[in-house]
Amino acid sequence: MVWRKIVSLFRRGDAKPSYGAPKLEEQLDELRGYIARDLRGGYVDADAIVDNALEVLELQPHGEDVLRAHARRILEDETATYHHESAAWPPLTDHDRLEQAFAALETQGVVCRQNFTCCGTCGVAEIGDEIDATLERGGPVHGYAFFHMQDTERAVEGGGLWLNYGATEGGEAPALAVGQRIAEALRIAGLAVDWDGDWNKRIHVPLQWQRRLAL
């Protein structure tokens, strides 16, 4: 992911001289954290999970080959653990409810995207392409809702989910109308909504992130 590479470059560029190489155990702990977060997010395939984790690590002195082998093993362990945990989940999770809400909104002309682009700025810049594609298929579009990759990570870490929203028509009133429609669909699906109708605020959904894995 581009934003991960940028973070990695900053980390390397800002690093102070090291008086001791990082221990392998320390790097493996850090590696496990990145892998577990992407795995539990539920949108990234196995190869990308490993690649993303290695991109943000200082690979020396242990080398990429060594850490990649450990990363594969860690991913297998974390996947088995997550499948075991998910067996005890309720039949309907908060993420299932989110998907129900998004599906309902799509029928109402609100284009909804999950884990969409690296950040909010890129999401707002690129959602127009998704709207255009929907219009080309003959569907009506009044607005959009999405959360980006960093939002997914925050949700996995227990911070709930934040949604961007907007309208195809300019101005505050159309955007707020779309926001209210989104909030209503989320509540109908059984999710709590923390949003006071302020145009300058994103919609917060204080959910428990439980997304079933395809791995």
Predicted regions and their residues:
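Generic detection of intrinsically disordered/low-complexity segments and helix-coil linkers/edges
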Residues: 28, 138-141, 189, 203
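An N-terminal amphipathic alpha-helical segment
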Residues: 123-162
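Intrinsic disorder/low-complexity detector
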Residues: 1-137, 180, 211-215
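A short linear-motif detector with a strong N-terminal bias
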Residues: 89-92, 139-144, 171, 182-184
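Short, conserved helix/loop micro-motifs enriched in His/Cys and acidic residues
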Residues: 74-84, 155-169
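Acidic, proline/glycine-rich low-complexity IDRs
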Residues: 2-11, 15-19, 158-215
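Aromatic-enriched hydrophobic runs in primary sequence
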Residues: 118, 147, 151-153, 169-174
